[in-house]
Amino acid sequence: MTHTPSVPRLPVPVAATIAPPDLADSTLLEVNPHPQMSLGTVELESHLDVTFSTVDLPNGASRELKADVLRPATGERLPLVLFLPGGAFLRCNKAMALDLRRHVAESGFVVASVEYRVAPDGGTYMDSVHDVRAALVQLRQHADDFGIDPRAAALWGESAGGHVAALTGLTGELPEFSGDLATPLGTVQAVIDAFGTSLLSAIADDFDEEVRLHYERTATHFSAYVGKAGALFSEIPEAVVAADPATYATASAPPFLLLHGSADMLVSSSQTQHVHQALRTAGTDSTRYVVDGANHGDFGVLADSDAALAWTSATVVNDITEFLHRHLDSAGLPR
């Protein structure tokens, strides 16, 4: 399959050719982009720039980590959904995917888009997980302020955020990841990983030789993110495996929904298949959809608008909200 749209300059290489996706134990979704998801059906209230943690950076500075919270303007306590933005582990902009977050909030959830440390902060995957867990704990401890049902929470991430969501969801009971946040409030009842990375050394496995060789021969920022700045992937296999969510798949893991576009030019769709198969082998409830023709989420807006529309179609977004209702409504307070 060859893709030749004009693409913007990006901090990661863009594939020219993509192998057909592995559909084992997965479902191929042939999505009509219309109708698009609904918006404006429920009045929302927002709480912006909510500080949930202050962290020390390697340069001696400190940084406040913040969340933007959306919820229906009712007095009802609702399950919490933490949204983790993507950004190639180079940036984390909590303002991303606003319409998607609005739709999910209108569907009956408290949706908090949260910041987490990334490579330019000197952050590693351990720091990202700690930050997300801090957001979970703080928001649930202040459930009264936001109308949160603290018994029910999910993680939902896109791209790099999908990686962090999966890793956080699978390590809630491990002391090395939880530290002083080892509490049930730091665990979740469901995880959504949308076109996320996993085993970073295999990020280009589905792509053309030029992109594969780039990752083999270049010490990228991904090496810094796994704690080995300046190293090639071939030099740090243990560190790469330690940062891979699939490493921590167990039978006690929460249910997972994984989604990936068949035409993803930035992250091989085999990355979510890798996590999906590890979860299934461990005996975990895992569902994976491959969206036919879809690109890398909002990246499609820049290069292929039709491919981007799949991610905001009623079909795909309804799969997300139905998954959340199925696993969070039963975990929370009677409604």
Please describe what each predicted stretch is.
Residues 2-335:
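Alpha/beta-hydrolase superfamily serine-hydrolase fold, recognizing
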